[in-house]
Amino acid sequence: MFYRLRFAVFFFLVLAAQPIISQGAQSRGAARQTNKAQVARMTRRPDTTHPTPSYIYTINNDLANNGVVALKRSADGLIAEVLGSPFSTGGKGLSGGDIDEQGAIRVHGEFVLAVNPGSNSVAVLRKQSGGKLMAVPGSPFPSGGSHPLSLTVHKNLVYVANQAAEWGNPASAPNLVGFHMDSDGRLTPIPGSRIEFPRGAGPAQVEFSPTGENVVVTSGFQGENASRIHSFRVMSDGRLHEAAGSPLAPQGASGTVGFSWSPMGDRVYVSNFRGSAITVFSVDRQSGGIRQVGGAYGDNEQAACWTAISADGRTLYVANFVSNSISVFDVGTGGKLTPLGTTKRRAGTSPDTKDIEVSKDGKHLYAVGSGKTEVAVFQIGADRMLTELSAGHSPVKISTGQNTTGLAVD
């Protein structure tokens, strides 16, 4: 009897322990499965079947209700205006057909910044789903001057170039003003950041170097004022300090408008509409000191005004306003330029070709047709030359506005 009772107790204990052992085994098995799943997620290749859509932005420059035009870009380069576009900037555009600027609109993370030249302000809009944009609280913000036409942004610093006058009509002293940008997109002026330029020689473009250490500004294209290239060192408080050799007058050409930084931030390639040429400048990354490298590189076209550079820095594209064309240069050792050829825009009303940008994947180039309020699309070939997409796909008409201004690719 005693042995049967002891066996019964032992059997009961074994049965009672089985769920515990089973649960422990299940827990260890589940842990192993979880670890495998985590590793799989970490090593999983990105989904390329549904790539994140990219967008292109320009400004319709509407005189009563300025707006940012958003166009969705597909992998084959085709673009189509986003539903609800244009998105109001809360300001006004500027009259006059020949608005010389580069950098009127910029993409910075989740924000799009755009100038309101007709109401002296800068709009900051936040990206929404489907390519839509919405103004941040407080936008638009005063630009700190008259007729803002170019801006640049790096991290939390923004600089705005106020040109102060329409073509040939000086009104007040043009300037450059700095702002701090907070995480919500609000702009606050930086005390002591204002830098004034001579009357009639307002800035055409302002842009941080790729690393944000220096800022270059082109100016002096209005009337017969001598052109100037300004180089500034960015100080710890966000203000700018003019560097050695600045300002510098380009040799061999004049009428500076747009420019592009080299990816390394040690050179700038500057367009000059008088003589339709490019001048190259070396910029010391530590001090911001600037000097011209070589002479002027002509493209045998009319009014070279806007530029774009490939991500690898090997190819420079130049938009010729009067010729309605885009010239292509090889960028060699030391910044030496060699012309590769020129592509004419299809059936544009001359003069019309303005801002240009290269897509992030390097496969397409986009060009603003300002007077006809349209954007042209070009495929970039293996030889780096441009071929405009077929009629019906290029150019793409903008729905509203006049004298379309600026171009930014997300």
Stretch-by-stretch model annotation:
Residues T58, A114, V160, V217-T218, ...:
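Residue position within the beta-strands of beta-propeller blades
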Residues N65-V69, S121-A123, G168-V177, E224-H230, ...:
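Structural motif
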Residues L71-I79, L125-L133, G178-L187, S231-H241, ...:
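Short loop/turn segments immediately following beta-strands, especially the blade-tip
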